[in-house]
Amino acid sequence: MTELARTRDADGRIVVAGGGVAALSSALLLAQTGREVVLIDPAPPSASGEDPSTSCVAQIMHPHGILSQGLAMLSEHLPAVLGRLLKVGGTMVNLLEGDGPPVDTVLMERWMLDAALRAETAQARAVRILADSRLTDVTAAGQMACAHVRGRLGGSTTLTARCVIDATGTHRRTWSAEFTTIREHHGSPRDFHSVRYKLMPGARVPPLSRVVTGRVTLPDDTEASIIRGPRDTFHAVVACSRHWPMRRHLRDPAFHASFFRAVPGLGAWTLPESSTPMSSVLSFASMGNHWIAVSEHVTAVVRAGDALFTTNPAHGRGISHALTQSLMLARALGHSEDIHTGIATYRHEVHKHLRPWFDDSVLLDDTTPKGVAHRARLAHVRKLAAGDPLLNRMTVERHHLLRDSTLPPPTTS
């Protein structure tokens, strides 16, 4: 049993809305503390997560990785989830391959983690699941919150709770205007076009510049990358400006294949004798960097996952951020006699430990002329980090040599 197993105020119901990593892991961890949890899940009751075609997650087939911080959290607090993840195909690798202490990560496709989390959530006694349902409104009722829920096939209900955790993703919420203050929005002017491949047995391909990734910068602000996945799969990714004249042609599988095969040092990975394509072109626009905050006067609603903040997915931090937030929620809300004090603690911890990663993502993306003004405004981040180990950790992160899981989360205070 972990420290989360302590029970405090077990009769305080918490409603968690969402069907992604942040929602499922938060429900599991809060249940460990003895809280009564109601999960409003948009997926149907039959959804196991193992059929990617039934998922509403746009990037369900894209390569993902769980970085060291998220992996340490799973190992300690949700080992059964990690075990299931590895069983369905997640692959553990050491990013440094012997150069210094091991830095482990799990390569996976998103559906693998969803399947592992769903299987464990379905078995959690303290989690009541309202499947095939969506959160349609939240209203305040003194120190309580009322979550209004509607099923996809009709019918509705209202749940009164000590706290509502909104982990419903990035979509717009007309009901949340009175709760939400959008702190920052930094769009990313880049598109990503990816094709999933399977390596042929015995294929001889050139080594990548890093253990699981290789990247080549091309003219016209375009990049080509190979990203290794589980079970001898990889993705060939082209990132380009949304203003690049050839962008629309990358959605054509034949054009994407011919374009990538001409990339120096990486094209050989996609030759017919090396690999077989396993998907059409998977295209998506970067979500950019969004930081969304719940107004201070709201004491019964919090956000988690992409509903709270997003960073450019090219930096590969989203899954670990979601897992970290769920642990912060469980520690703050599960171990507080006064749940509203716990909410304040959670908000403080998120801003202290995760805000620096958001700022760093903005700085990494801050290369356009429009970004000059951002650099001046965010100069304080560099100044605060100047004498702090955070600067070194972020330098390592920039080079994809991910933080050792024994380090504490970064902070600028």
Regions found by a protein language model. Give the residues of each.
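Glycine-rich FAD pyrophosphate-binding loop
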Residues: 31-59
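Predominantly flavin-linked oxidoreductase catalytic cores and closely associated redox partners
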Residues: 123-256
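Beta1/beta-strand and adjacent pyrophosphate-binding region of the FAD-binding site
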Residues: 4-22, 38
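A conserved beta-strand/loop capping segment in the N-terminal third of enzymes
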Residues: 72-110
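Short beta-strand to alpha-helix junction loop
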Residues: 65-66, 100-119, 173
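FAD/FMN-dependent oxidoreductases across multiple families
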Residues: 230-232, 244-349
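Conserved FAD-binding subdomain of flavin-dependent enzymes
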Residues: 29, 45, 60, 64-88
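C-terminal helical "tail/cap" subdomain of flavin- and related membrane-associated enzymes
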Residues: 330-413
